[in-house]
Amino acid sequence: MALRPAKIDRYVDKPAYTRREYIRGAPGPKITIFDMGNPAGDFEFEVALHTAEPVQIRQNALEAARQQVNRYLQKNVGRSNYHFKIRVYPFQVLRENPMATGRKADRYGNGMRRPFGKPIGLAARLKRDQKILSIRVNRQHLKFAIEGARRAAMKFPCKCYYRIYDKEGNDVTTKILSQGL
């Protein structure tokens, strides 16, 4: 079965559906690596990507963003000069009621009888202003981290914004951007 458009699953309008012990056939997570680069490194700044609205992000989008940002940072910054971390986990099990279409579909389709649906994928459920990912770098690589966050935001079905934090966790976005990169 083909992958449905992400706009179908992005809204947080249903109750959470996460208890795998009760779900038969729940798929495993496609995203397995959450820390990339140099996790033990000491970096000056952290560029964090936040959501602007409550949303569900499918695991396919998270994995696509992870691959894109990691490849971009490895190429431009070097493996030991950044720490990239995905901060959300896809717990929410998405389900679909497959509807029969085509000729004589009424003979073998169930329609809305027992319409609960079968598990088709996983998604991460995010609140407004929650961090999706963070990239820790030093000052000379800050523009590459901002560009990586921008590229990751294109993969997600919601409006996103980035913030720059210093070592202590203070928001220094306006200060850094006013000084120029």
Swiss-Prot record:
GO terms for biological process: translation. Disulfide bonds: none annotated. SUPFAM superfamilies: Ribosomal protein L16p/L10e (SSF54686). Gene3D superfamilies: Ribosomal protein L10e/L16. It holds the Pfam family Ribosomal_L16. The keyword NADP does not apply. GO terms for molecular function: structural constituent of ribosome. Keywords: Ribonucleoprotein, Ribosomal protein. PANTHER family: 60S RIBOSOMAL PROTEIN L10. HAMAP family: Ribosomal_uL16_arch (MF_00448). Belongs to the universal ribosomal protein uL16 family. This is Large ribosomal subunit protein uL16.
